[in-house]
Amino acid sequence: VVSIKKIKYMRGYLLKSNKLVCLIIISFFLLSCNNSGRSDNTADKKTTKIQKKAIPIIFDTDLGGDFDDVGAMGMLHALADKGEVNILATISCNPSPLVVPSISLINIYFGRPKIPIGSPKSPTRSQDSRELHYHDSLIAHFPSAYKNSDEAPDAVVVYRKVLSQQPDSSVTIVSVGWVTNLRNLLLSKPDSISPLDGKELVAKKVKSWVAMLGGFPEREKEANAVSDTLATQYAIDNWPTPIIFSGYEIGVDVKTGLRLIKEGPVDSPVRMAYAVSIPKRPKNYKYGNGSYDQTSLLVAARGFEPYYSYKTGQFITSDNGSTKWKYDPNGRHKYLVEKMAPDSVAFEIETLMMHNPKNSTE
């Protein structure tokens, strides 16, 4: 028989024990919260420390024929507003009279009127927007610092000036047209801008070249490769730093433009170019336009992952502009291989194309 005294003792013990358990649980909870806060703060500090520095980019575009160049330029400025890239220059490889005025008005719209612009002065292919009429539509609606492409300085001079001012091995060149300017840059001589010749200057200042060019592993004729075949051959054969190729097959299924037209800023030149062009060829653009140029810029700004993998080797061009690939694990060339679904890549790209500009005064 348990005595009354013993029962009272046990009851008191249990009450004390429960209080002790509660105190232990509460203490553990508070400690966990405190540790969690410390962990988050540490993570924030680490994130701040490892935050990527804006990638210095020279953007070389034909901005003629296909209007994906306009989409890529909108995307370029969106990435700059996000702090992911630093736009050093926007250069035309296309001497068509309306190209430089169009480049200028896009830069102005996005609040960057002072970005250097260059245009080729040597003979090369000239192409306007043909029956799509997006050049003249843009020029009629938006202010530009240029009336004609001839007013812009020589592309090679702009390249040499910009490169000479940058840290060594820092610049990424993104070309989304034919590569006449890059051939001419390699052939340029020492001058008052730099004591280095073109190839030496590229080797010293350029980290990599990302090109929308060719088709892989081989393609008979891709527009940018055949537009100036001699320039294509010379530039690729003599380029002293790594080259990444985004082939025709990468951009063709990355369809953009329809959401931009429906939901994009009504005053945007990027939206206007697509809104003017897509209805002109309803069968071709039923699901939007291919994002050939945008995929090149995406990789230049954000790297391969999670969008693409790549193959390493050597890009080989022929006299007629057809392209082939020689696999070589030690090669300096890479071409993109699809990894993320094209629709997912398209959504990310088109979101950038729909960007509303900040009031930047760079």
Give the ranges of each region predicted by the language model.
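N-terminal acidic, glycine/proline-rich low-complexity segments
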Residues: 34-362
